[in-house]
Amino acid sequence: MNLLFPRAGHGPWIALVAVILCWTVTASPRSAYAQSVDVYEQRVQKEVDTDTVSAGRFDDGRMWTFDHPPLDDFESRYGFRPDETWLRRARLGALRIPGCTASFVSPRGLILTNHHCARSHATDVTRDGENLIETGFYAETRAAERRAPNFFAEQLIEIADVTADVDAALEDAETDAERQAARQEAFASISDRRTAAVDDGYGAFRTEIISLYDGAQYSAYTFRRFEDVRLAFLPELKLGYFGGDTDNFTYPRYALDMALFRVYIDGEPYEPEVHFDWSTEGSRPGDAVFVVGNPGSTSRLETVSQLEFRRDVTDASLLRLVETRIDALQAYAQDNDVSPAFQDRLFSFQNVRKLYRGRVEALNDAYIMSRIRQGEQAFRQAVQQDTSLATSYGGIFDSIAAIQAQKREFAPTYQALRLSNNPVFSSATLRRALAARQYLDRQSAGASEDDLQDLRAQVVGTSRTDEINETLLTARLQDFVHYFGADSEIVQAILGGASPEEAAQSILATSALADSASAARALADETLDLQDPAVAMITAMEDRLQTFRSAWSGLNAREADVAADLGRARFAVYGHEVPPDATFSLRLSDGRVAEYAYNGTVAPAFTTFFGLYGHHHEYGPDSEWGLPARWLSPPSSFDLGTPVNMVSTNDITGG
């Protein structure tokens, strides 16, 4: 979720743009539609000559840090220059929650976020016999609000540049290990010192050191942390996810993609110093809007060779991983009753699929990649034209390219085992087997039981249902076939001539690691050994895994060092004129409310409830656009012309 908001004087308002909160600035820009048509014609209607493509000043985005907003540019573009009071209000009104952004929207601690950001937490507070995801939830009294476990909200109260402190701590470090240790020690010391300086005894505080420009700059972000957060309102899934996966990550959209929680301190609703007020006025097409949010991650400042590696290896393999898991889970769901948590996991996979489809498509887009190459060429020339920079950083682009070439040699192993220890994407039995092989190796080397305690816990792990475990194990064995090759020694040793489906069934029928209980018994009885079928699966890959782990770790460490030099070179050339890549920390992005050209027509700047009801009737009640029962007969006083979603030119990404 991100927040958009207008300057004081025009009236603060909130519109649901997959929940977006906005302050607007009225302006008289060149038609945003005309601008969008220009881009559309360049890239679609005309054949692009990549030799004539030129990079733009803001190709690396407009997600600004709060301590370095481009105020002169804002004033030039919008006739509006935010002052410190405005920026402070924007910062304090925004919140970071697990994986998402929220905002204070009432003087009594209500916070607004996206529907998908609340679904897993709604599942956590669901009671026996309930299905809050399907039915929605509304707490008619504060006493009825439900505290969400594992949920928190963080308010950014202070930002400080601590680059000099970190760099000073690294001066005497000579090796990679020494630098890493010194950096972590500096982070801890700075965090403790800055947290103690702001702690007023009212709530919890923590300081996080944010690395910007790949380590060229470091900022200390100090947060007030709220840990008593309670669910107050969640629309039904049919409304909060209206249009389903089809409409997700698209526009026009009509979903009421929102949820409300309330922050408490000492058992009472928190009264924030700043909150965003509601308004019925809204914005207009062409108005400037500013997004405040915590964008998760971007890779815009990477070199062309790094982006090509993403295109061919990392992002491509993650997209395939997600797509195959979606297929597996959907096949399982067709034949079995599934829980709300299962359904939410599937929705999350579909969300990631659309995200990475877009990334992979962009990385394969000749126009986009040509602009990136032009931007890199201009950067390289700027480095070479400065004698000092050329001496220090002239070879970094070739060094990074060489590292990518070496990483490609290990790509099949990386891809085959991608996220193999992730509980969302990977079989529990595979995760137990990876831990079990390490456990047995260290046990045979004489490690003490205390040293083995963490590995024992991983071997026992947590268990999925047998059906999902089998589904995910089968999918992983199919990955082995895809990346190692059906005729490879590894695949032949693991499958023994069986299909991935047959091999998964056999492993789960005979392995002590099939579930948590049997794994615990095997450890207690000391019967777990290398002959266990699941452990044998890992043993078949052990030589390759050892080589991969050693090489991959070294290459990544080298790349991090060179990337830090790249960041220092970029900062020396451009300073804060180029914003750093997203780091799931608070940013400010500027843009305009704008319609745009698509599919030979025009997407409106706003969608309304008229469109929502139109989709329900056009596609039918059993479609992804079917409304929940209580929404089928709205009261006569309900204005169907009320905007529900909007679109703008702001630079945002997930988070």
Where are these regions (language model features)?
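Terminal presequence/propeptide segments associated with secretion/organelle targeting
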Residues: 2-5, 10, 19-655
